[in-house]
Structures are given as C-alpha cells and as structure tokens.
Amino acid sequence: WHIGAAAHYAQIDMIARTARMNGKNVYFPIGIDRNGLPVELYTEKKHGIRMRETERGKFLDLCKDALDDLEAEMILIMKNLGLSCDFDNYYRTDSKEYRALTQATFIELWKNDSIYLATRPNNYDWVTGTTIADAEIIYEELPTKLVHMKFKTKDGEVIIASTRPELLCACKAVIVNPKDVRYTDLIGTKVTVPISNQEVEIQAHHSAQIEFGSGAVMVCSYGDHNDVALFRELDLEEVIAIGQDGRLTEAAGAYAGLKPKQARTKIIEDLESKGFVEKIEEISHRTPVSERSRAPIEIIPMEEFYLKQKGSVEKMRELGSQIKFYPKMHQQILMNWLDSIKIDWPISRRRYYGTEIPIWYCKKCSEPYLPEPGEYYQPWYLECPAEKCPKCGFTEFVGEERTFDTWMDSSISPLFITKFKKDEEFFKRTYPTAVRPQAKDIVRTWLYYTLLRCENLTGKKPWSEAWIMGYGLDEKGMKMSKSKGNALDP
C-alpha cells in the first residue's frame, strides 16, 4: 500500500460511517485480492526464480507465503487507519471457497453456451507468457523507425512504409485505398515482397490511409488488429511469424530465433544493403503494451476460452446508464470502453497463481468433462471426479492446466459477499448492493467485468451507485506507484 491507497480506503470508510449516521444498516465487508500476475512477478523477483522452471506446487506455496506477509501488513494499515469494516470476516480471492464460486459460475456459463473454446489471434505478452485481454493493454508513444521499402512490380516498384519490417515473411497482401488514383492501374496485380520474395496481390480496401506513408500498406499476420480483421475479411492464409517465446519462428528463415526488435534491426540492414530502402524516418509510434510488464504485445494465434460479450454491449450500456456515478463524468469511461469492444473476452491464462479452469479431457476422444459445481477443483493436480468419459467410456483423463484471467475472480465479488448460491435469504436481502467504490483506472476492467458477469448470472446490475476515485499523485503530479519509487508509505 501507499498513501493514495490509504486515502482511498479512508474515503470508503467515510461513506460507510455517513450511512450509519443516517440510520442505515450498513454491510461493509473487506476483501483481499490475492490472485494474478503481480504476486507471480513478485515471487520470481524475491526468490530469483522463474515460474516455468519451478515445480508448480512449490511455486504456488511461495506465492501464498508472500501474499500472507503482504496481507498482514495491509490489514495492520487498515486497522491503524481506524476503518470500520468487518475485520473478523474478511475474505480472500484465493480461498478455496472463493475459487469454488468462480469455478461454479464458469460451469454455469459453459452450460448456457456463454463460454466457448476457439483458436484466434490474441494479444500476447511474451514477457509473462500468456494471452491478455484488450482491457489489459495501454498505449505508449515509443520511438521507432518507419521504413519505406521497395516492393517490385512487373514494370517497376511500389513503396510501402512499415514500422514492422520483421514481419515481411508474413505478408500476404498489399492494400491501397480505392480512391487513391496513384494505384488504380495496379489493383489486382502482383508485387514481390523484399527479403522473403513471395508474390502477393495488390487489393483495394477502404482502410488504407492515402496520407500515411506511400498510401500502400502491407497486410501481415499480425502487425496489429487491423491486420487481424483484414486476414478474416480477405480470407488470407496466416503465417505464424512470432512464437510464444517472443522470438521469430522458422517462417522467418535466417531471422528465426531473434526477438522482434533484434530482427527489425537486422532486416533493415539487409534491406539497405540490397537496395530495397527508399528512406527511413524516425517517428514516435502509438504502441500497444502490456499494462503489467510494459512490453510491446504481439498478436499470436492461440487456443483460449472466451466469454461472450459482444452481444451484451447494448445491455451493458443500458445498465451503465442506470448507475449513478460519482463524479458523473466517470460514467463516460465505461461508455467509451463499451464503444471499443470488438471481440469476446479471452478468459484463460497460461499462468500458475490463479483459479484453475475446472475441466478434464478424455485421453481417447478429448471430450471435455466439467464436474458438479460447489467444490474447488485443481485439474492439473487432482484426478478427474468422473470414473469414465460420458462420450466414449474411456477411463483416463488429462487435466486442464490453464487458469482464469484474474478479473474472472474479481468480477464476482458482489456475488461472493452476498452469499450467492450459498444463502438464498441473505442474498435476496443484500443483492444488488448499494455502492461500488473503486479507482478510475479499473473502470474498464473491474467495473465493466463485474457488470457483465453479474448480469449474466443474476439478470440484475450489481449495484446502483459507483463512487470513482482518482489517483494519489506525487509532487510532480505523477501517479504514485511503488514500482516507480514515488509512493509514500502510510
């Protein structure tokens, strides 16, 4: 914790105390969020180890020990602040009871066909080795090179500008704007991609910006999400140029094994030496990076579990408009996020310290088996509860190793504290809750995902009011963060 977090909780306490003074019967639970990537990174750094090189059970124990120490410090600060919450019954998001509820909600949504398994291009954080959702991405202006490259035509050349020349091997088309008269006669003809030498077609497409670079754009798998959309629309065959280790694959030929930045430097050198470069510009580029690792993300086809959300956007907009925001302007953060949703939510992660996805697969026919809800399951560690596969009768299973996105846990906190699926009378009395106090930087994650999940499971919004706090700032006006070293200890 730092002083900003302490101030945040002190203000939450003021809300609770004011309600009591107005004669209300206040339910003020306190929870400790103990899942996710931060504790894994903390544990790796503290012990000088790597998660994937450590036995899973041992790594989980080390994470739990670290969390126990951090939690004790956090609770002490809360008590010293004089918070009036219920310390005798505070909950942890990594408890068996909490994780069992997360798994139970997954099983219910699976049976309702709200969750599915699919292989799609996903945001991939190669530093942490897992898929991440759009909500876990931020954009930073980073320096890079805009390389104007010569693609050979039958009678000449076309200049194409790109910040990702390392993906030339994955180029499957070149697009130009149909209104760009410079390329009218070239639409439908072929060009040869430099270095990798494959022939691709020049196609007309409205997304090509006439004013950017030369106006001609290479379409590769995958430089950005526009490439993803174009590959689907134009029915192009993808080339997996970057692997899960964050390095170029064999598809890159002589550049295989290099990290993208290394490959970019080497390919630019080779392009220049072979006469394929018209010019190079030093630019500042709006780059998508992982919110956690701050590494530029790659887009890699991976099999993941998805929770349907595209079809719920208008419903979320309706519910969001019914929630009273304090201050009112922060309601727009939610609305802007709803406007940006284009894909379903990838909810599976390739990490260790999180709630496990409760599925076993038949070793013979691969049929998934989901157990009865109510218990906490660890498929990577425990035997399948089923004696035989319900589809083929085979008796051997293999457990799912992936965990949930931590927001799958956090998003059901209103359900857990109101004893959803546990005490129907208490649930009816306390749900929906009155107010959600939280920081504004997680409106598009915690607030939105809670709204989505709770509506999916109950048909109701989880609260009627949202109190949104800003950031604790240092003397320079920068957001306080322990990682930046500018935070004050409360």
Specify the residue positions occupied by each region the protein language model found.
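Short active-site loop/helix that positions an aromatic residue
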Residues: 41-45, 166-177, 227-236, 415, ...
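Glycine-rich, acidic and aromatic/proline-enriched surface loops and short helix-turn segments
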Residues: 69-80, 196, 410-420
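Carboxylate/His-rich catalytic cores and anion/metal-binding grooves
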Residues: 23-32, 165, 171-190, 400-404, ...
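Active-site cores of enzymes that catalyze phosphoryl transfer or operate on phosphate-rich substrates
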Residues: 191, 291-295, 411
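Residue patterns forming the tRNA-binding/recognition surfaces of aminoacyl-tRNA synthetases
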Residues: 44-158, 212-365, 446, 478, ...
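Short conserved beta-strand and strand-loop elements enriched in small hydrophobics
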Residues: 147-151, 188-195
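N-terminal catalytic cores of NTP/NDP-binding nucleotidyl/phosphoryl-transfer enzymes
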Residues: 1-42, 102, 161-163, 195, ...
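Conserved active-site neighborhood of enzyme catalytic/cofactor-binding cores
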Residues: 1-30, 125, 138-150, 217, ...
